[in-house]
Regions:
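Non-transmembrane alpha-helical segments in soluble domains
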Residues: 27, 37, 152-155, 159
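Short coil-to-beta-strand transition motifs
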Residues: 71-75, 100-101
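Short beta-edge strand/loop motif at the mouth of beta-sheet-based domains
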Residues: 14, 34-72, 171-176
Length: 176
């Protein structure tokens, strides 16, 4: 499970999760627009249904999806900095929130993993510490709290996809 915190000034969300897979694989899950709709979401909640990305500094991206209530949403922005497979910095403009001007920074650090099998998708014996930093909430505590809950779910979904192949379609539905 991801660890997550909101800074005392309520401006920054910081989260971390360990993924038992090489950072190249984690980077791919985060940046490949054909993979994002496979893992970003859960039945009974919301899910991304379409993503597109011009993956370069200055390039634009968007993800569209639908909530359990049928309401559509969209997140879009621009890539500010990219250093594969270590770093992604992007603006974050969601249709479902009143925040503007926020920035998401993803840092991926390779870490050794002891006791893993030497065959299968993680045969390299390395894992990835994913650090997420979402800035720009400007004392908007309700939005920061909402996004913190969302990032906790998203990081868990990504971890389950990369480690176990779990998708939004195969994941256990959220109970009402």
């Amino acid at each position: 499970m991801a660890t997550i915190a909101i800074t005392p000034d309520q401006n920054v969300i910081e989260a971390e999760i360990f993924v038992a897979a090489p950072r190249e694989r984690v980077f791919q899950a985060l940046t490949d627009p054909t993979q994002t709709p496979r893992w970003w979401g859960q039945k009974g909640m919301y899910r991304v249904t379409r993503s597109e990305a011009d993956f370069r500094p200055g390039g634009k991206y968007f993800s569209e999806g639908e909530g359990v209530d049928g309401k559509k949403f969209r997140v879009e922005g621009e890539y500010l900095e990219i250093d594969p497979p270590r770093l992604i910095v992007q603006t974050w403009v969601p249709s479902f929130s009143n925040i503007t001007g926020t920035v998401v920074r993803w840092e991926l650090e390779s870490r050794p993993v002891h006791g893993l099998q030497t065959t299968g998708p993680n045969r390299m014996g390395t894992g990835t510490l994913v650090k997420l930093r979402h800035t720009g909430f400007a004392n908007n505590r309700p939005s920061a709290e909402d996004h913190a809950r969302g990032w906790q779910r998203v990081l868990g979904w990504m971890q389950a996809f990369v480690e176990k192949g779990e998708t939004a379609d195969t994941r256990e539905p959220l109970s009402a």
